[in-house]
Amino acid sequence: MSFRKVVRQSKFRHVFGQPVKNDQCYEDIRVSRVTWDSTFCAVNPKFLAVIVEASGGGAFLVLPLSKTGRIDKAYPTVCGHTGPVLDIDWCPHNDEVIASGSEDCTVMVWQIPENGLTSPLTEPVVVLEGHTKRVGIIAWHPTARNVLLSAGCDNVVLIWNVGTAEELYRLDSLHPDLIYNVSWNRNGSLFCSACKDKSVRIIDPRQGTLVAEREKAHEGARPMRAIFLADGKVFTTGFSRMSERQLALWDPENLEEPMALQELDSSNGALLPFYDPDTSVVYVCGKGDSSIRYFEITEEPPYIHFLNTFTSKEPQRGMGSMPKRGLEVSKCEIARFYKLHERKCEPIVMTVPRKSDLFQDDLYPDTAGPEAALEAEEWVSGRDADPILISLREAYVPSKQRDLKISRRNVLSDSRPAMAPGSSRLGAPASTTAAADATPSGSLARAGEAGKLEEVMQELRALRALVKEQGERICRLEEQLGRMENGDA
């Protein structure tokens, strides 16, 4: 008798999410209420940026990661736009540079002081003007320095050289309707887009040509999104004709049928996908949801494997994702999200439980670093390059929690009652007599300390034996499960 495979082996099967304590959240932030399906949040290893409500224009907060707790209403903002800010994105090659797109039809690039803002920042480093309607999408090139993509409600995609404020490419005939999102591939030679006409397009920006197109990737009328994966596949989220939320995986070489298609639920919030190329895990966050679902993408069918769901009580207004080089590798942290509530930002840590305190090579392969692989001029000339990788081993800090320290009192230094006059032995110095009198009590104290130490050691040995017994039991159960899956039992 054969059994259907119930459990797929995966090192990410036990990933769990944990919100941080309240004192590590960012409180009293007036998150933007603008109706736009943006993340409203961007984060890097130094700063957290959140689009906020602002009177008389658009603004966003930039906070050092360490500035947790209540944020004063008078805290300075980045406030140079004359209309609401719709999207923000940190430069992957400079942690102090951020770009913003706004309803005022402009893109602005800002230089944040190394230690954060001490006064409102109103003067951008660069203003990029080329759109005729509001700019809702900002995306830096992953490997070329100073190359920035913007897309607006004029259905135009512009690619800029920020260093010279020059418009490099204008793609104004490839999208007949509103663009929902864009995503670069790993080396920045192509990007994919999701459009209101229900099509997913793969575009070569330097040639200005359509490489591939899939009409009605999702048949529902609600917003959809598309992202490139590291292997060149395209992952999409959207809605079915019956308004059920869907996930799909596509091969750009053949967009006729999806490699995989899954239906999630019938909620109406747009699904925002966040992809980790190092682990091939996609985290899906629905706007207005109170959960984060995560899936592992593999090369074997069914390709999209559900892992787990993190659930909380409050719905999310937006979400930011920390780059891999900003995680705490010594705590086996594989992702960290910054969830926007109505009035605060709450970090959520995703962790893989591991027994060992050693650096986990399988969880942390070399990842994209902050160094650009190309200059803008090289990319324009036709060159492509993968991201320059760095090791996270240097960020690993060994845990010291397992060190057993026994603190022993110096019993000879204890204060003692004064001896009665004449109680010393005849001819013996008082200090000698005191030391002699202290010797029996000192021995008793040391014996008591030794007894406590022995109790601790016995308890430690008992715990080790229990852990070993449970480990053996788990191994037996896994073997039994394996035999059942293979039809041997």
From Swiss-Prot:
WD repeat boundaries on the chain: 80-120, 130-170, 174-213, 217-260, 265-305
UniProt xrefs under PROSITE patterns: WD_REPEATS_1, WD_REPEATS_2, WD_REPEATS_REGION
Gene3D superfamilies: YVTN repeat-like/Quinoprotein amine dehydrogenase
Subcellular location: Cytoplasm, Cytoskeleton; Cytoplasm, Cytoskeleton, Stress fiber
Keywords: Actin-binding, Coiled coil, Cytoplasm, Cytoskeleton, Phosphoprotein, Repeat, WD repeat
InterPro entries hit by this protein: Coronin (IPR015505), DUF1899 (IPR015048), WD40/YVTN_repeat-like_dom_sf (IPR015943), WD40_repeat_CS (IPR019775), WD40_repeat_dom_sf (IPR036322), WD40_rpt (IPR001680)
Mod. after translation: Phosphorylation on Ser-2 regulates the interaction with the Arp2/3 complex and cell motility in fibroblasts. Phosphorylation does not seem to affect subcellular location.
GO terms, biological process: actin filament organization; cell migration
Residue numbers of Phosphoserine PTMs: S2
Coiled coil regions, renumbered to chain: 449-474
Pfam families xrefs: DUF1899, WD40, WD40_4
Positions of the UniProt region annotated as Disordered: 414-443
Any Gene Ontology CC annotation: cytoplasm
Predominant subcellular localization, coarse grouping: cytoplasm
Compositional bias of kind Low complexity: 427-443
Top-level division of the source organism's lineage: Eukaryota
Molecular function as annotated in GO: actin filament binding
Protein role: Regulates leading edge dynamics and cell motility in fibroblasts. May be involved in cytokinesis and signal transduction.
Protein family membership: Belongs to the WD repeat coronin family.
Subunit structure: Forms homooligomers, but does not form complexes with the other coronins. Interacts with Arp2/3 complex components, including ACTR2, ARPC1B and ARPC2. Binds actin.
Descriptive protein name: Coronin-1B
Source species: Pongo abelii
